[in-house]
Amino acid sequence: MALLQIAEPGQSAAPHQHRLAVGIDLGTTNSLVAAVRSGVTATLPDENGQHSLPSIVRYTQDGIEVGQVAALSSAQDPKNTIVSVKRFMGRSLTDIQSGEQIFPYQFEASENGLPLFVTPQGQVNPVQVSAEILRPLVERAEKTLGGELQGVVITVPAYFDDAQRQGTKDAASLLGVKVLRLLNEPTAAAIAYGLDSKQEGVIAIYDLGGGTFDISILRLNRGVFEVLATGGDSALGGDDFDHLLQAHMQQVWQLTNLDPQLSRQLLIEARRVKEALTDASEVEASLTLADGTVLKQVVTKAEFDNLISALVKKTIASCRRTLRDAGVTADEVLETVMVGGSTRVPLVREQVEAFFGKAPLTSIDPDRVVAIGAAIQADILVGNKPESELLLLDVIPLSLGIETMGGLVEKVVSRNTTIPVARAQEFTTFKDGQTAMAFHVVQGERELVDDCRSLARFTLKGIPPLAAGAAHIRVTFQVDADGLLSVTAMEKSTGVQSSIQVKPSFGLSDTEIATMLKDSMKHAKEDISRRMLAEQQVEAARVLESLNAALAKDGDLLTSDERQQIDAVMAKLAEIARGDDADAIKQAIEVLDEHTQDFAAKRMDNSIRVAFKGQSIDNI
């Protein structure tokens, strides 16, 4: 006899029932969905047994095609077939059109300058296109697992900025899917390998996908993944290999002024040749022209290696920089994990092995390893595993800070700090009676604001009109597990506050990060000198501002000679402060301080007299 189970409406009668959650690798070229079932993590195939879904969306008069069916039509209808949409996420139309690559799409700009694809279905943005890629993956998962998903973990490149990460979340939101977490792709790979092998030590994650390259150096210790440093390039991947081979084949065949359809056909053939060269020393390429002419040529592995050599070397240079940032050497790296379909290219594996001095790990399909790691994390976050089994510590690639008087940067969260993180610092007002304060949030390693990257600006109003330096404003920087930054400023006595969530409209490539880091080291000595000068100039301005206010109020306490002497020293300080000698400014401030000691004493005496005027000794 079966037991009757009774539960309150809306509550589960089986509190320990397995909750449904999946990991989604939303890739530039292909996307996958994976889940943990009966303790085994695996990618989920569609009804045709295909695990990967081409990240391609075609818009027609009759509807929307996604995946393989869209890919088959891409050569005939390139204008309405959107590929590698991940590259457009969070980027402005100006940024896209200023690049070297020419796209077959018709673009229009949104109100905030972001790209809109003009299609037979109307204007669509990259977020909407991404949602169309997610849709069949979510439907596949729910059909396979037999129920509605309670959440997903979606992977993103480590160098996706806030706008790109938010766009990825928004794509899921359009489908009504709850995003448990955005997970960096290299970190997802570390989860997939780290839990299986239970190793400890330094691990390198070399992730070369269709459109992005990421290198992460992680330390694995007792189940804790700590990302020591990250690097890479958000605009370098297997797509670039395809375009180089496409250009080579076009040159050999002496083809000029290709229409979009023939150009897409040539790109598809270049991709086929690239993949075939993984296991062959040479491959015959062919292309059928509109008039029926069939062109053929043989592409050798040596030719292909020569074409892509510079790009592969660029990834190795990123590895070298990131190791230096992590404070470790290649010899200390125990294992190198290969992620992304482009790591199947023999030259890539050869160069990685030569650099790290050992053969990379490839036991998990490099196309599926990220999705598998995301699924493991989703299973934990949805509550199917104790979270103590795994702890993730990602890092902030560049310092975050606030502009202070004089154009200086006060760093609040240092570079390579693990996230999620919250840091707070107190600031104060510069002028008497100041009731508002403007905040400028910046990113970078330099000492002056002009040399850093501007992220956002906001204003805190309602500060009590107190004397300069009397108000206390607490500024809190909070970076969540998805790398999104929130900045809050609060005046402590009143509780009045203002905040902003930073969503930059432009992406941040690893080239920009590398340049900013190199510039900070190159100009370190100069920057310190400039900072010291700016600090002294700010101090001089503060002293003069304060003294002018004091003279306006109590100047009649001075004799004519005393006033002239102070005015002369103040004028001298103002003149010196306009120069570039920090020591001279500091000395001039000290001289002014000496000349105003008597004035300060007179003000104190006068304040005491006023305070006690009319009071008897007994009351005192």
Swiss-Prot record:
GO terms for biological process: iron-sulfur cluster assembly. Keywords: ATP-binding, Chaperone, Nucleotide-binding. It comes from the Bacteria. The keyword Nucleotide-binding applies. Pfam families: HSP70. Coiled coil: none annotated. GO terms for molecular function: ATP binding; ATP hydrolysis activity; ATP-dependent protein folding chaperone; unfolded protein binding. Chaperone involved in the maturation of iron-sulfur cluster-containing proteins. Has a low intrinsic ATPase activity which is markedly stimulated by HscB. Belongs to the heat shock protein 70 family. This is Chaperone protein HscA homolog.
